[in-house]
Amino acid sequence: MAKKVINVVKLQIPAGAATPAPPVGPALGQAGINIVGFTKDFNARTADQKGMIIPVVITVYEDRSFEFITKTPPAPVLLKQAAKIDKASGEPNTKKVGKVTKDQVKEIAETKMKDLNAADIEAAMRMVEGTARSMGIEVED
């Protein structure tokens, strides 16, 4: 018989840097998860992606055991890294803050493909381009 799910927790945590301190500790504590066990497992699994923010979905079962799935970094984080900027534009229609090439967009779309609900790579690229436009990043050919 399958274990009964009692809670699902979604967090965005820096890769390899999960600590029991807020915001991770309180969110996991409320769900009844072994905080130290989760942070060790998460840090081990994401050690190769240091510096990235990794979304994680934690499923908590009735017996207080848990399992988690790591996702790909959010598109805005990847776009900021590709455009070499720290912050997106507050006025994306008038104030452009950076540029990315179609090749960089394609690379980001390929990375994000498994987490996007896109049928093909072109659709994923259009999604990433839309995110770039809303951040004030120009897409060059």
UniProtKB/Swiss-Prot annotation:
Q: Which InterPro entries match?
A: Ribosomal_uL11, Ribosomal_uL11_bac-typ, Ribosomal_uL11_C, Ribosomal_uL11_C_sf, Ribosomal_uL11_CS, Ribosomal_uL11_N, Ribosomal_uL11_N_sf
Entry-linked Gene3D superfamilies? Ribosomal protein L11, C-terminal domain (1.10.10.250), Ribosomal protein L11/L12, N-terminal domain (3.30.1550.10)
The question of whether Ribonucleoprotein is a record keyword is answered with: yes
Classification via CDD domains: Ribosomal_L11
| KW Ribonucleoprotein (keyword) present | yes
One Pfam family hit: Ribosomal_L11_N
| Source taxon at top rank | Bacteria
Modification after translation, per record:
One or more lysine residues are methylated.
Which keywords does the record carry?
Methylation, Ribonucleoprotein, Ribosomal protein, RNA-binding, rRNA-binding
Q: Which GO terms describe its biological process?
A: translation
Family matches, as PROSITE patterns: RIBOSOMAL_L11 (PS00359)
Q: Which residues form a coiled coil?
A: none
Q: Name one GO cellular component term.
A: cytosolic large ribosomal subunit
Give one GO molecular function term. structural constituent of ribosome
* Record field: transmembrane: none
Subunit structure as annotated in this protein's UniProt entry: Part of the ribosomal stalk of the 50S ribosomal subunit. Interacts with L10 and the large rRNA to form the base of the stalk. L10 forms an elongated spine to which L12 dimers bind in a sequential fashion forming a multimeric L10(L12)X complex.
Q: What does this protein do?
A: Forms part of the ribosomal stalk which helps the ribosome interact with GTP-bound translation factors.
Q: Which protein family is named in the record?
A: Belongs to the universal ribosomal protein uL11 family.
**HAMAP family with a match to the protein in the record:** Ribosomal_uL11 (MF_00736)
Q: State what protein this is by name.
A: Large ribosomal subunit protein uL11
The organism named in the record is: Lactobacillus acidophilus (strain ATCC 700396 / NCK56 / N2 / NCFM)
